[in-house]
Amino acid sequence: MNVFGIGLPELIVILVVALLIFGPKKLPEIGRSLGKTKRAFEEASREFQDEIKRQTAALEEEQQAKAEAESPREISP
């Protein structure tokens, strides 16, 4: 298990220190808060990536349409 470069022994030490600092009653609340924050960050990141993809596709379509409009066409007699 290696989350953010933190192994299991380091994670245990962090949890013990958090337990000592915040106490057993406050720890679940902090965990829920961190979980909600993580989900919100992931959702914002996903929305950002989707918007970048949409903008890139729109720009490519615009460039393709411009190239087609500027390309010379054969005129048949």
UniProtKB/Swiss-Prot annotation:
UniProt keyword Cell membrane, yes or no: yes
Gene Ontology biological-process annotations: protein transport by the Tat complex
Region (Disordered): 56-77
Segments of skewed composition (Basic and acidic residues): 63-77
Gene3D superfamilies: 1.20.5.3310
InterPro entries, A to Z: TatA/B/E (IPR003369), TatA/E (IPR006312)
Membrane topology: Single-pass membrane protein
Main location: membrane
Assembly description: Forms a complex with TatC.
HAMAP family: TatA_E (MF_00236)
Role played: Part of the twin-arginine translocation (Tat) system that transports large folded proteins containing a characteristic twin-arginine motif in their signal peptide across membranes. TatA could form the protein-conducting channel of the Tat system.
Family from the record: Belongs to the TatA/E family.
Protein name, UniProt field: Sec-independent protein translocase protein TatA
Gene that this sequence comes from: tatA
